Amino acid sequence: MLRNGVDIIEIDRLEKINPGIRARFINRVYTESEIEICGNNYPCLAGRFAAKEAVSKVLGTGIGEIRWKDIEILRGEEGQPIIKLHANAKLKEIELGIHHWAISISHSRTVAIAFVIAH
């Protein structure tokens, strides 16, 4: 069965996070590898945030049953985004019989969007 998920986020939502809690937020949502990829590049972080939301929609759970770090958005050999799942997200992937993922992330100056397809 083909499944899809999409999410869009305003980039300034991340930029405007209170500096006093920004590091804690980033460390709660993103893995070390994702932080290494994006650094303080807010369009990159926003794209991965949208991607995690889109993946959670494909899995039919939303964020909650699945933790943010259970969904990891890495870089493939050619720089393309790839999805790597852990813990509850991986269990849900197996339960749903998902074997293939496709993801697209894009952003403008103001928003980031991610579209995910799985089967």
Question: What do the PLM-derived regions correspond to, one by one?
Answer:
Residues M1-H119:
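Core catalytic alpha/beta fold that binds nucleotide/phospho-ligands
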